[in-house]
């Protein structure tokens, strides 16, 4: 059980579940949730932040991730992934993603991951690019930094 709701997330991306996402128990396999979470964040960085993975000098590497599961999802269904930012540092970002069945006010899962942005050539931490910071600031939860 969770107290999270759709209202706690600033951007949503609908994702169609696939037959291949299902496991032997008849619901979306837990590992597929990570794919939904990654797709929601990366989709936001590309569509709202103008991130170009091929041309960017700074790239985000996932250094930590996790997910809590509350209820199953199935095929066929539309899955709404709500994205928020809970930490926006000099070179790192912590995202949280609520994974919702369409029209369900409570999430089926709550996942997170941390990106550390590194220079593509040196693989050393670098400042978060200004265009990405500007795109992520609206998703920062009140009281978080």
Q: Can you annotate each of these PLM segments?
A:
Residues 32, 64, 96:
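Acidic-residue sensor for enzyme active/binding pockets
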């Amino acid at each position: 059980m969770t107290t999270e709701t759709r209202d706690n997330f600033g951007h949503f991306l609908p994702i169609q579940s696939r037959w291949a996402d299902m496991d032997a128990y008849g619901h979306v396999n837990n590992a597929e949730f990570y794919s939904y979470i990654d797709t929601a964040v990366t989709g936001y960085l590309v569509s709202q932040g103008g991130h170009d993975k091929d041309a960017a000098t700074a790239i985000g590497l996932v250094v930590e991730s996790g997910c809590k599961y509350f209820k199953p999802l199935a095929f066929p269904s539309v899955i709404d992934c709500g994205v928020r930012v809970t930490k926006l540092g000099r070179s790192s970002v912590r995202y949280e993603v609520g994974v919702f069945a369409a029209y369900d006010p409570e999430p089926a899962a709550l996942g997170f991951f941390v990106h550390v942005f590194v220079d593509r050539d040196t693989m050393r931490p670098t400042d978060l690019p200004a265009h990405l910071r500007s795109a992520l600031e609206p998703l920062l939860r009140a009281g978080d930094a």
